[in-house]
Amino acid sequence: MATAILDTGDRTFFTRLNRILFTNPFAVEPREVSELLCTEVVIDRQAPHLFTTLIPVVEARFERLAARGFDTLRPFHGEDRELLEHARLFLVYHRFVPQLDRLIAAEIDSGKPEPVSFSRDVLGALTERGFSERVAERHLGLFWQLRRAYYFIDSGLLGTSPCMKQLRHSLWNNVFTYDARVYDRYLWNRMEDFSTLILGETGTGKGQAAAAIGRSGYIPFDARSSRFKASFTASFITINLSEFPETLIESELFGHRKGAFTGAVDNHQGVFERCSEHGALLLDEIGDASLGVQIKLLRVVQDREFTPVGSHTPQRFAGRVIAATHQRLNELRHEGRFRDDFFYRLSADIITVPTL
């Protein structure tokens, strides 16, 4: 098949479109969309998002390409192919937003992975346009992640003030990084390597912010069962370190084996063992952790391993670590009550929740 090339007008349009599509949705301005549409955009407060105003224009561009005989991506290569892929993914994603929303509601009700009744339609819409089956399945997982992230970041937090808009912006960047292109290419299945530290006064909603991150991780689609491999309802676990005495905290974190200490009459799974590989664990009130506990937590964050109390066999932790505190950690570090190396490992991204 001969290689097709976009003309100058189409390449300019799709390049500008891609720039908008990879923008944080909580930062898109009407001006950017207006410039692409060459007309002033009137904000519809009832519309799901400003992005939806682009749908008919993008569809029209693809119809023009189809009229020239290019109804799939297969003839295109290199940068042209990449530009068109992202535009096609944009259309397919928005076509299935209502079904994704219903699936979110169904899993909230059931607490388990629900059948993805529309999966064949999504995969077909992609493969018939030139995506391989493997790539189509990966993008179905990304569609699911995108919709959950928008749902929990948008509706899981209260308020529309500038500081809350900035918080939503920061949470989205935490899930998809500051460069969504890099995330799409390299990091979509590696975000557990990056810990997050959430700071804020008591009662400001640090837990809700952490939950928005924890429920928005990438979960692969399983074509054999036509379900996603885990439910986001079980993907977020939290433990408040201030609630446990020093004698129990290690058991709650790492678990223990039968006979490890007086009263250990059975094996016990700690939160690290219970956390899904597609999920996240919130260590709330991390400032209350003793230096001894910090050393053991550092091992988990650094080496991704932990050992239950009474065991000599290390276990692998595959989830993501989120820590939160109302305390001023820099003061604790200065006083020698919080380890510098542990602080740096936790703070790959620091998010500050505004006061009410």
Which residues does each PLM region occupy?
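Conserved catalytic/coupling elements of P-loop NTPase cores
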Residues: F194-L356
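Short, mixed-charge, low-aromatic patches
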Residues: D121-E133, F143, Q166-R168, Q302-D303, ...
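Long, hydrophobic, amphipathic alpha-helical segments used as structural scaffolds
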Residues: L100, I104-G111, V182, Y186, ...
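Short, flexible helix-adjacent loops and helix caps
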Residues: I108, F131, A180-L187, D222, ...
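N-terminal accessory segments that target, anchor, or regulate ATP-driven/P-loop NTPase machines
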Residues: M1-G159
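Pre-Walker A (pre-P-loop) alpha-helix and adjacent loop at the N terminus of AAA/AAA+ ATPase modules
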Residues: I153-F194
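Solvent-exposed amphipathic alpha-helical surface segments
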Residues: L103, Y178, V182, S216, ...
